């Protein structure tokens, strides 16, 4: 029966899922490598590279580049984005009513500078993810470890509050290489590439071939 068949395929399914997760980590690491190769990646270059990854799987929600920005650098980055045609670009946070409001001044920010797909996600540009404790914790874990970190979270922007998202954070450091000490990693940290995925869709893609008609996940 289908249960026995599914049990027999359990190890195979696990290996497939592990391989897919490694592919996701490789993709977000590739975004980081893009910024290693050049000190300045344009919005168009980011779009072209991300598009090649987005075409591969429907469960990829988005790719983002999120730089570490000091207070003294805020105005320049906002002006740069506005000159690129994003006339309403400015650093934002979520209000208690879950609407975007201007981010207050502080020592440093982690704004979403680039995001693909652009359409449908453009309202997230400029959002300071460090204003959300869960996301700031992921940034700090990636920064301090020098490795990709991942976590499941609800959609913070109410696009689909019932769907869990999986976020992969890949850190980037000045000089391109990962510093050997935590202190150096904190000092040379430049930002993170982020991949947002719907892993439940990926799991469904693996499991559905073994379900008999009328059985739904």
Language model: regions and residue ranges:
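Membrane-proximal amphipathic alpha-helices
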Residues: 2-28, 35-43
């Amino acid at each position: 029966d289908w249960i026995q068949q599914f049990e027999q395929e359990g190890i195979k399914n696990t290996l497939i899922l592990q391989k897919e997760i490694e592919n996701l980590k490789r993709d977000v690491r590739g975004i980081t490598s893009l910024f290693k190769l050049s000190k300045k990646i344009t919005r168009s270059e980011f779009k072209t590279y991300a598009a090649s990854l987005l075409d591969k799987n429907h469960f990829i929600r988005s790719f983002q580049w999120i730089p570490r920005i000091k207070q003294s650098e805020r105005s320049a980055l906002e002006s740069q984005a506005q000159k690129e045609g994003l006339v309403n670009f400015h650093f934002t946070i979520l209000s208690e009513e879950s609407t975007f409001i201007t981010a207050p001044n502080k020592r440093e920010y982690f704004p979403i500078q680039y995001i693909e797909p652009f359409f449908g996600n453009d309202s997230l540009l400029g959002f300071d993810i460090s204003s959300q404790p869960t996301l700031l914790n992921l940034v700090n874990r990636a920064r301090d470890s020098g490795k990709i970190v991942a976590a499941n979270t609800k959609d913070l922007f109410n696009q689909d509050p019932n769907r869990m998202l999986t976020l992969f954070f890949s850190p980037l450091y000045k000089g391109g290489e990962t510093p050997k000490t935590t202190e150096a990693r904190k000092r040379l940290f430049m930002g993170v590439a982020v991949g947002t995925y719907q892993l439940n869709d990926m799991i469904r893609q693996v499991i559905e071939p073994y379900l008999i008609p009328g059985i739904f996940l």
